[in-house]
């Protein structure tokens, strides 16, 4: 796609860019026929080995779907990051995990009391476990401008293809969807914010 849009292609590149922009804008309205959604929002699966054993499924989605998801995410990225505040450092914060680890170490070293606890949670397979209706509800509340696209992508099961067969993707976001991490962060932000409020 980058080659098609190269300046060296002159007028052809401009025509491709205009057509691509129109197509992405159409997708952002959620205007995708129901018959096409399972395939368009589906993906090919590849499996990566985890360090501790097991495999991590990665969905390699349609290039145009990924492009649209990136465009949708960029439209609301600043809003999302400011909405999360300091509660969530996984999405939109380069080296956020490092910052969290350093902050936790500083906190533990500065505490002089026996009634203080540092509670660390690792949500096992959480990315793929959050119910889609919750993601859609949070997107409607926090980022209504991209809700039509998110609804089109996640309001019904999509197809994941592997080795000539397909399985139905019905829960969570696809690993490999550019909107997956922020949708996960959007969904878990309210309980994390509430927990912070109660613990202060």
Residues of each region from the PLM?
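Conserved pre-catalytic core of RNA-dependent polymerases
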Residues: 1-190
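Short, intrinsically disordered, charge-balanced linker/junction segments flanking boundaries
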Residues: 193-200
């Amino acid at each position: 796609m980058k080659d098609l849009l190269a300046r060296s292609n002159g007028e052809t590149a401009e025509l491709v860019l205009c057509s691509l922009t129109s197509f992405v804008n159409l997708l952002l309205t959620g205007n995708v026929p129901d018959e096409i959604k399972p395939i368009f929002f589906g993906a090919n699966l590849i499996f990566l080995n985890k360090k501790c054993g097991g495999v991590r499924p990665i969905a390699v989605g349609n290039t145009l779907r990924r492009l649209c998801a990136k465009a949708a995410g960029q439209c609301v990225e600043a809003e999302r990051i400011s909405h999360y505040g300091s509660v969530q450092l996984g999405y939109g914060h380069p080296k956020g995990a490092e910052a969290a680890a350093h902050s936790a170490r500083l906190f533990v070293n500065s505490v002089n009391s026996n009634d203080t606890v540092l509670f660390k949670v690792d949500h096992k397979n959480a990315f793929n476990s959050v119910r889609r209706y919750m993601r859609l509800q949070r997107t409607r509340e926090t980022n209504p401008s991209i809700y039509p696209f998110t609804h089109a992508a996640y309001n019904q099961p999509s197809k994941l293809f592997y080795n000539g067969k397909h399985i139905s993707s019905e829960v969570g976001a696809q690993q490999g969807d550019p909107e997956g991490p922020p949708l996960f962060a959007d969904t878990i932000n309210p309980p994390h914010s509430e927990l912070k409020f109660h613990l202060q």
